[in-house]
Structure formats: C-alpha cells, structure tokens
C-alpha cells in the first residue's frame, strides 16, 4: 500500500505561532500577565469601554453585562477576562467550550457561582448544542431549565441562579450561533498591536524577568512579533538565551537582530511557514488568484491551519488578499521577495 503524508499530524510549534505552546509557557504567561486595566497595554478602545462599563456596574451594584471578546489568538482575551473579574472584585471561574460536554458540566459551574461572579468560557464557539441550549435562560433570566428523567416520566426542573457575568472568548466569532451572540451585551474585538505598544510590553516583561535590555532591543523584538504580545514574550525569552551566551545577558538592537535572524524570523515577522506560503502563491500559481485547497496541497498544510494561523497576519500586513476568485499576492509580497510586480 502506498504511504501518504499525514497532513493533520501534530507538527512542531512555530516560534511565531500565537497559540500557547506548552504548560510551561502558560505558567510564564501568568507571571507576566497584567492584573489591572491600568497595567494592560494596548487595545485602547476596548480598554476604555470596559473601564466605563465596569465602573457603571459597580456603581449600580449590578452584575456586569455578558462580555464577548473576539480576535486572533495571543492578543490578551484571557488576560482581559481575569482583569474584568479583578476590577469587579469578584471570583473568576474558568473553563473552555470543548470541556463542557454535557449540560450537567455547565450546571455544576453555574450553581457554584457567587453573586456577580465571572464565568470565563474560552473557545466558546466550540460549545455543544446541548450545553448552549441550557445556557440561554441562564444568560437572560439567571435560571437553569434542566430535564430530569426520560420518556413520560421526564420533568423540567427550574433552578434560580445568582446574577453573574459570562465572559466568552473566541477566535472564530463567525462560528457563534446568532442566538448566543445576541445575548452578549458587550462585544469587543481585539486588534493586532502597534509596534510601539508591543515594545512597551517587551520592556515591561524584561523588567519583570530582570533582564538588561535597551530600548532598541525592545523595538527590534516588537517589530518581528506579528502584532501579538504572546509572540513578543516568546521571542524575548529566546533572545535572552542568545544574549546570555553571546553578550553576557545584555540585549541591544544588534543582539536581538542576530538572535531573531538565527531563528528565521525576518524583519516583517515572517517565518519559514509564511514565506513558504507566499512563495507558493507567487511562484507556483503566478501570484494568484488561487483556491485555498490548491495552495494547501502545494505546501502540505490543512486549510484550517492556513486560515487560522498563517493568513490573518499576512492579510493584516498587506501581503495577501482574499478575493471571490481565491488568494492573491499583493504588491508588497512581490517587493518583499525582490520580484518584479505583476501588472
């Protein structure tokens, strides 16, 4: 039998991937995580809105309206959920959509909430339909409607819940059902970060890690971090390793540049995977337009990986366009690879 490559097999984590790579990285993220809105850097519009809504809820002595946070991974949705709970002065219970398999799983969480507590559900777009159905009355009326028993003996039991705030986070807002989306009173989209905000985040993390780093070093890391704080902090740790060996632990612009070049992260934050994708569109498909399935087959990646991991940053940075006819490389992509621009 012919052996074929398993394109869905687990692959090594990219250093510029926005997803959390390991439990160890998760622990370090928690240590570097800001605790208040004042400490939270960037996302100025979302932060300003949340500050007003939180103050208003506290002034009235009410639970904050349910909050939906959406945007690409690594931009601070989990951090904001923790900050919301801290600013409100209440407890936070955290779970994720895939974990809540049965209605009873959600019921157990909801019935253990104290008044005004925050329930944070990450990947809320992955809730099962059964769980989502019992969530509706909980969000609207602070009430659980649970069916007990089966067949003719089945009966509905209503359980009153304390007022609470659901904070849902998702990278795929389009996958939320309309009834669920409509039950969020506050909806905030998190955007990719500006380099100046990322440089501030890198400098703050360096201080917490007690690193000797110049302003130029922070800026060099920031501009290659793909607009994502999680990536910036990961690159900072790898640059720290390089500096410990090559420069007695001091991180300046030159050391940061040398370290990141060694890691194949170029000045635009593109890594080998990004360049492979763009080169396929440019060289194998004449710059496009090309269908997603075709380019996925050409580079040996799943369409989900391309849509969720590779494309968002390339589109945001103007290297790629999505058109009704397929993906197309932009003028900036041609120039980045030193190619003549197609007219």
Swiss-Prot record:
- Please name the top-level EC class of this enzyme: hydrolase
Q: Indicate whether Cytoplasm appears among the record's keywords.
A: yes
Sequence positions that bind ATP: 32-33, 74, 77-79, 140-142, 183, 193, 230
Residues reported to bind Mg(2+): 78
The record's CDD domains line, in alphabetical order, gives: AAA
Q: Where is this region: Large ATPase domain (RuvB-L)?
A: 4-193
Q: Has the keyword Secreted been applied to this entry? A: no
Primary localization class, coarse = cytoplasm
Binding positions for DNA per the UniProt entry: 322, 327
Q: Which GO terms describe its molecular function?
A: ATP binding; ATP hydrolysis activity; four-way junction DNA binding; four-way junction helicase activity
Q: Where in the cell is it found?
A: Cytoplasm
Gene Ontology cellular component? Answer: cytoplasm; Holliday junction resolvase complex
The record's region (Head domain (RuvB-H)) falls at 267-343
Q: Which reaction does it catalyse?
A: ATP + H2O = ADP + phosphate + H(+)
Entry function: The RuvA-RuvB-RuvC complex processes Holliday junction (HJ) DNA during genetic recombination and DNA repair, while the RuvA-RuvB complex plays an important role in the rescue of blocked DNA replication forks via replication fork reversal (RFR). RuvA specifically binds to HJ cruciform DNA, conferring on it an open structure. The RuvB hexamer acts as an ATP-dependent pump, pulling dsDNA into and through the RuvAB complex. RuvB forms 2 homohexamers on either side of HJ DNA bound by 1 or 2 RuvA tetramers; 4 subunits per hexamer contact DNA at a time.
Task: Please give the name of this protein.
Answer: Holliday junction branch migration complex subunit RuvB
Q: What is the organism field in this record?
A: Neisseria meningitidis serogroup A / serotype 4A (strain DSM 15465 / Z2491)
Q: Which gene encodes it?
A: ruvB
């Amino acid at each position: 039998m012919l052996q074929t490559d398993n394109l869905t097999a687990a692959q090594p984590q990219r250093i510029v991937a926005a997803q959390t790579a390991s439990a160890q990285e998760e622990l370090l993220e928690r240590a570097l995580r800001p605790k208040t809105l004042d400490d939270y850097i960037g996302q100025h519009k979302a932060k300003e809105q949340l500050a007003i809504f939180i103050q208003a809820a506290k002034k009235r002595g009410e639970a904050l309206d349910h909050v939906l946070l959406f945007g690409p991974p690594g931009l601070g949705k989990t951090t904001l959920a923790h900050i919301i709970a801290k600013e409100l002065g209440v407890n936070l219970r955290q779970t994720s959509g895939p974990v809540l398999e049965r209605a009873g799983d959600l019921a157990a969480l909801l019935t253990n909430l104290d008044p005004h507590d925050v329930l944070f559900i990450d990947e809320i777009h992955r809730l099962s339909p059964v769980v989502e159905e019992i969530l509706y009355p909980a969000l609207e009326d602070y009430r659980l409607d649970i069916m007990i028993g089966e067949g003719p003996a089945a009966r509905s039991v209503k359980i009153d819940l304390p007022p609470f705030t659901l904070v849902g986070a998702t990278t795929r807002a389009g996958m939320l059902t309309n009834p669920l989306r409509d039950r969020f009173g506050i909806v905030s989209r998190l955007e990719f970060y500006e380099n100046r905000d990322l440089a501030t985040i890198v400098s703050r993390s360096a201080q917490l890690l007690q690193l000797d780093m110049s302003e130029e070093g922070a800026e060099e890391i920031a501009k290659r971090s793909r607009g994502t704080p999680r990536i910036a902090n990961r690159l900072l740790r790898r640059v720290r390793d390089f500096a410990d060996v090559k420069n007695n632990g001091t991180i300046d612009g030159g050391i940061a540049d040398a370290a990141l070049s060694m890691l194949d992260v170029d000045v635009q934050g593109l890594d080998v995977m990004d360049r492979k994708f763009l080169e396929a569109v440019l060289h194998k498909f004449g710059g496009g337009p090309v269908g997603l399935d075709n380019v996925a087959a050409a580079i040996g990646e799943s369409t989900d990986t391309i849509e969720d991991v590779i494309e968002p940053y390339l589109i945001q940075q103007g290297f790629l366009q999505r058109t009704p006819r397929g993906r197309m490389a932009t003028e900036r992509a041609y120039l980045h690879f030193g190619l003549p621009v197609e007219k």
